[in-house]
């Protein structure tokens, strides 16, 4: 980081960022991430104590992947290396290698506590049933590929998910509840009980014993993204190299860029004057706290005009462009409904956090290389200072996606986002066709006042169209919640059957 010098947080005294600026007046200022919290580990003042790793309170972690240090404050390690945690600080922890005794920062999502389930390749922590299905059905897996995950419904319990094949449905995933014995053991069927999950896995690898398939190999998992650089929230423009223009919107451009020569990112450049720096920074600090795997991750900001918004890079671009592409236009209906379910999941999180998107449409959904849909630009609409966008007569106002009460009275709520989601469903099922084809904005407003709603496209199932029509109820309070919409879309093809298999 050039002119940064390493300082570590000290319990009880003044706190220093890892990347505090030096006295050099030309050194660009890095401002810490507003969401990071610091927890000194039990060994933080124990630096030279012999036998670290033997105390009862020590947090010993093992590396799940290799990591090559980018900065001199970081600690390189190989898969399988063990380290003692000195300080838990957001996504980067300070640790000491038990082998080399070297200290430095490590990405916390690259390690797991020794002897924890997370060290097992078949254990997927905190993954939902639906995401388990998405991952097991992804390329690279086979019949009998499996994972054990935390139960969504019963805290402290687990579920087994297995890839299967059904002549009618094709590739599918079956789920089994793993039940717990009073003595701490585990079973799927009461006739076969095990003292550990490892024993359970070994047993069902030898034979299916009533499961749909014999367990073959753990579900393929990719190395997680490294956490964003520690304490790099407000960053200098010079740290970014804009490389390829990905698109241009009403308020700026989107670029593929490299941060500090090592991290691929997307950069949204805002036209000067499109928003006040103070309002933007206040909103960005709030947006930074909204972290969910179906929301585009906000990494950093440049707060001098022109404002830059730095986010994770999404390889397939906007959902709108993807749906119109050769690859997107070949996606079958179940995949389109899966896209819709992913977006509903992200919006259910926004709803739960009492936040509002205000500009939900296919152009503001981004698609990853593995076809994960993530919501982008949440909250930005609120701070735009452009009458062309904020006034309903303005050329940039997204009339066709906007709920009547937001058009007429300017009142945006999560229920107006639900209306927009109904329009977004129509965009998805028509592969990116503009809503209300052939109608101008004033014609749309007049038609809505008469009670007009877009008709059902030929390829759209009645049940999906019913969701759209519920999203377009005139009275906002009669529209469904995103939580409800997510539950319907998640189980769109399986609502009539039990999600979990009966005991074998």
UniProtKB/Swiss-Prot annotation:
GO terms for cellular component: caveola; cytoplasmic side of plasma membrane; cytoskeleton; cytosol; focal adhesion; Golgi apparatus; lysosome; nucleus. A lipid is attached at residue 2 (N-myristoyl glycine). Subject to autoinhibition, mediated by intramolecular interactions involving the SH2 and SH3 domains. Kinase activity is also regulated by phosphorylation at regulatory tyrosine residues. Phosphorylation at Tyr-389 is required for optimal activity. Phosphorylation at Tyr-500 inhibits kinase activity. Residues 34-49 have a biased composition (Polar residues). It catalyses: L-tyrosyl-[protein] + ATP = O-phospho-L-tyrosyl-[protein] + ADP + H(+). The modification Phosphothreonine is found at residues 15, 180. The active site is at residue 359. The keyword ATP-binding applies. It is found in: Cytoplasmic vesicle, Secretory vesicle; Cytoplasm, Cytosol; Cell membrane; Membrane, Caveola. Residues 122-219 form the SH2 domain. One of its GO terms (molecular function) is non-membrane spanning protein tyrosine kinase activity. Phosphorylated on several tyrosine residues. Autophosphorylated. Becomes rapidly phosphorylated upon activation of the immunoglobulin receptors FCGR1A and FCGR2A. Phosphorylation at Tyr-389 increases kinase activity. Phosphorylation at Tyr-500 inhibits kinase activity. Kinase activity is not required for phosphorylation at Tyr-500, suggesting that this site may be a target of other kinases. Ubiquitinated by CBL, leading to its degradation via the proteasome. A lipid is attached at residue 3 (S-palmitoyl cysteine). Coiled coil: none annotated. It is an enzyme of class 2 (transferase). Keywords: ATP-binding, Cell junction, Cell membrane, Cytoplasm, Cytoplasmic vesicle, Cytoskeleton, Exocytosis, Golgi apparatus, Immunity, Inflammatory response, Innate immunity, Kinase, Lipoprotein, Lysosome, Membrane, Myristate, Nucleotide-binding, Nucleus, Palmitate, Phagocytosis, Phosphoprotein, Proto-oncogene, SH2 domain, SH3 domain, Transferase, Tyrosine-protein kinase, Ubl conjugation. It comes from the Eukaryota. Residues 34-53 are annotated as: Disordered. Gene3D superfamilies: Phosphorylase Kinase, domain 1 (3.30.200.20), SH2 domain (3.30.505.10), SH3 Domains (2.30.30.40), Transferase(Phosphotransferase) domain 1 (1.10.510.10). Its main location: cytoplasm. Belongs to the protein kinase superfamily. Tyr protein kinase family. SRC subfamily. This is Tyrosine-protein kinase HCK. It comes from Macaca fascicularis (Crab-eating macaque).
